[in-house]
């Protein structure tokens, strides 16, 4: 086989491998994102809790819930460099 054909086959194989690997990672990410809400995303105590032990804060009538860190946690994360 000529070097050009070998290079083309190597390139196609590499692209196929990377595409399969990317699809696996994407499905893992999507599944974990469904399970909890990140900071400043909507949340619900029963169906969609907040990630990383962040509090789910709601308005006084129990609607418009959002994941928010408290002031102590915000300062702690800032100090740690997160």
Curated annotation (Swiss-Prot):
Tissues showing expression: Expressed by the venom gland.
Cellular component GO terms, alphabetical: extracellular region
Propeptide residue span(s): 23-34
InterPro entries from the UniProt entry: Spidertoxin (IPR004169)
Keyword Transferase: no
GO molecular function, one term: ion channel inhibitor activity
Predominant cellular place of this UniProt entry's protein: secreted
Keyword Iron-sulfur (UniProt): no
UniProt-annotated location(s): Secreted
Keywords: Disulfide bond, Knottin, Secreted, Signal, Toxin
Disulphide connectivity of cysteines: 36-51, 43-56, 50-67, 58-65
Pfam families per record: Toxin_9
Signal peptide from the UniProt entry: 1-22
Family statement: Belongs to the neurotoxin 02 (plectoxin) family. 04 (U16-lycotoxin) subfamily.
Comment field on protein domains: The presence of a 'disulfide through disulfide knot' structurally defines this protein as a knottin.
Protein name: U16-lycotoxin-Ls1a
Organism: Lycosa singoriensis
């Amino acid at each position: 086989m000529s070097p050009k054909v070998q290079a083309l086959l190597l390139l196609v194989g590499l692209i196929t491998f990377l595409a399969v690997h990317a699809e696996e990672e994407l499905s893992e990410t999507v599944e974990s994102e469904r399970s909890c809400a990140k900071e400043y995303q909507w949340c619900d105590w029963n169906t969609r809790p907040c990630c990383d032990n962040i509090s789910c804060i709601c308005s006084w009538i129990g609607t418009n819930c959002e994941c928010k860190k408290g002031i102590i946690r915000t300062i702690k994360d800032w100090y740690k460099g997160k």
